[in-house]
């Protein structure tokens, strides 16, 4: 039986070494003159001094960790109980006692449903007052209290178990601006971004009353030059193709964030000190081809109003592309979308981390890599196309499924962990 306790983190990676076989069986990609049959290197884990502690092969990432049921066993379209259809879902989370919470910007409230899909209640409405929202972008639960992030008013509203408004939390900002982004861990705290006086964007960790716990000035952040996300100067900056979004999250009591090339992740403790680095071999993600660029150009022009297409075509005269696709994260190809998610879960006594692989091939369903806390690579999970994962629990995987007409539904897919359990027994000698 699958038993997973989950925490939704908005954005990125693990704290432990990755492994699918022993160190003796794994070598870096072969150099000239070496055995070409040596396993292809996937991940190399080092400490802050650069000392390698574990290497993992690519094959471990290619096996299936969980089978996803062909049909969702919970489907919510928003019309249950006389409600309006779902529109612009900002966040979905599993709540206590077998419930689901859906932060939805169309109705500007948080809907609560049971696992049959029946609508139980709605909290909040459009406005600026207590318990009202301007833009819903994040959800989190701590015991039976619900934390809801409003990016427009840069605040967090806390609701009790009966849906009653309790209080407002405004995270303190050492960077000189109010928070703009939200990640929640019921055991660690609240992670936000805020923009400083010079325009730099940094990460801040806060307690559940908004008090500042730590800042991470040396961690990669969206406006940090290490990220390479700032366009060239001039009226028409180059089109930045296939760039992964800034990725960071709370896990194992600290912050994990990416560096510039998207093949490297840094783990910082609660005090901001860099403890470990994961380097993903740049031999793994496939190269960007001329066909990839041409296809992205065609999609951009087709999605543009005919009157505006000449301007789009002029902008596409200057295109910047990386040599290879990023290893993980998400991107719309041209326009940055909401940050990709990181899902942390527990399976029995093991903690897992799910990381989204970069969607290099259009039309292929989103793929997630799954790791145990000790770094063992369970494998990957592939979901249907147009499905965005938000959380994992014993009930399955919940997220937003959008059809070709952009109609949204919140769905839950069952997960079959039989392969994971059999591998665990085999590794234990059972």
Label each residue range with its predicted role.
Residues 1-4:
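N-terminal secretory signal peptides that target proteins for export/translocation
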């Amino acid at each position: 039986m699958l038993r997973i306790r989950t925490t939704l983190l908005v954005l990125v990676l693990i704290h432990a070494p990755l492994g699918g076989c022993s160190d003796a069986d794994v070598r870096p990609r072969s150099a000239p003159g070496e055995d070409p049959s040596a396993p292809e290197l996937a991940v190399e884990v080092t400490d802050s001094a650069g000392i390698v502690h574990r290497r993992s092969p690519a094959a471990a990432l290619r096996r299936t960790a969980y089978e996803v049921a062909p049909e969702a066993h919970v489907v919510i379209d928003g019309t249950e109980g006389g409600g309006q259809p779902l529109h612009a879902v900002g966040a979905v989370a599993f709540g206590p006692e077998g419930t689901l919470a859906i932060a939805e910007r169309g109705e500007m409230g948080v809907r609560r449903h049971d696992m049959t899909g029946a609508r139980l209640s709605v909290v909040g409405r459009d406005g600026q007052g207590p318990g009202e929202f301007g833009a819903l972008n994040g959800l989190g639960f701590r015991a039976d209290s619900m934390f809801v992030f409003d990016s427009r008013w840069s605040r967090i509203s806390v609701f009790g178990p009966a849906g009653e408004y309790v209080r407002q939390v405004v995270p303190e900002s050492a960077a000189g601006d109010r928070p703009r982004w939200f990640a929640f861990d019921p055991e660690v705290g609240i992670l936000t971004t805020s923009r400083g006086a010079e325009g730099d964007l940094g990460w801040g960790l806060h307690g559940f009353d908004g008090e500042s716990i730590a800042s991470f000035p040396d961690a990669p952040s969206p406006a940090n030059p290490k990220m390479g996300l700032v366009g060239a100067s001039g009226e028409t900056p180059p089109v930045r193709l296939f760039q992964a979004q800034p990725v960071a999250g709370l896990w194992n009591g600290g912050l994990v964030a990416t560096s510039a090339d998207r093949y490297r992740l840094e783990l910082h403790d609660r005090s901001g000190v860099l403890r470990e680095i994961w380097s993903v071999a740049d031999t793994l993600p496939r190269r960007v081809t001329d066909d990839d660029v041409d296809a992205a150009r065609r999609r951009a022009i087709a999605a543009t109003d005919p009157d505006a297409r000449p301007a789009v075509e002029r902008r596409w005269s200057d295109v910047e592309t990386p040599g290879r696709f990023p290893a993980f994260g998400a991107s719309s190809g041209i326009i940055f979308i909401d940050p990709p998610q990181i899902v942390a879960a527990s399976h029995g006594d093991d903690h897992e981390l799910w990381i989204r692989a970069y969607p290099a091939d259009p039309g292929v369903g989103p793929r997630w890599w799954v790791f145990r806390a000790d770094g063992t690579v369970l494998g990957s999970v592939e979901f249907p196309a147009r499905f965005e994962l938000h959380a994992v629990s014993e009930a399955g995987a919940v997220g937003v499924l959008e059809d070709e007409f952009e109609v949204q539904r919140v769905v839950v897919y069952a997960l079959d962990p039989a392969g994971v359990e059999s591998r665990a027994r085999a590794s234990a000698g059972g």
